[in-house]
Amino acid sequence: IKSGDDADSEAEANLKAARDLIGEAIRLAKPRADELIYCVIGAPAEASIHNREAIIEAAREHVDSVMLCSEPFAVAYGLDWLEDVLVVDIGAGTTDLCRMHGTMPEETDQVMFDIAGDAVDAELAKQIEATCKGAQFTVQMIKDIKERYGYVGDAPERVVVELPVDGKPTSFDLTDQLQAACSVLIEPILDGLKRLIATFDPEFQARLKERVLLAGGGSMVKGLDTAVEKAMNERLGGGKVIRIEEPIYGGSNGALKIAHDMPEDYWEQLK
């Protein structure tokens, strides 16, 4: 379920997909028939009330109680980094930023924008169409190239990929195209960081800048942590960016910890 309100038919299809996904995840966990099922679901930081209700509705037939939390909050909670931390969670459809300062984050502590993994894919496809005459590819091929070779900054090595041209595998150097595509992430991240730092307590802004966590699948782009840190030093007067050890599972690890720790008042009873 992405941000924004979809047309009714697409919204219903998305709801069914989310419902089926939750059901399959629970089936794989093999709960006993007498066990109550509690589910923590990560949502984009600025997900609308409509979309939050849709997520709860998707969970209704499978779980007894549900809790929604912002995805970057789940990352920070799982790492026990809850004081003066900025989390940048780069997913497929959205990049979510969350400012942690010892309490549950409020709306003003969070920023979301829709330049994320899908935007990198779209830019890479555009770059290939413009520079690789006759090259044929699919969305999945683009994702695979990005996930294997994506980088910003100095190229670790030349990236040469085979794509079919009129049925014949043909080698293309995509080094520059990959850098251009992956670089679309940097400016929005910097804008979000600047907004959350500038509106924080001035006494602790310097500490906040030194504790920026990169998470999510998009954080695996090679050199992204270094590039964001360099941009922070140039435009914000300093900064330290750390890529978390488990960028793919950081949010789910945090959600599991939240499920164990949160009292009953925080849960929404569905049954």
What would you call each of these model-derived segments?
Residues 93-94:
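Short acidic, Gly/Ser-rich segments with clustered Asp/Glu that frequently serve as metal-coordination loops
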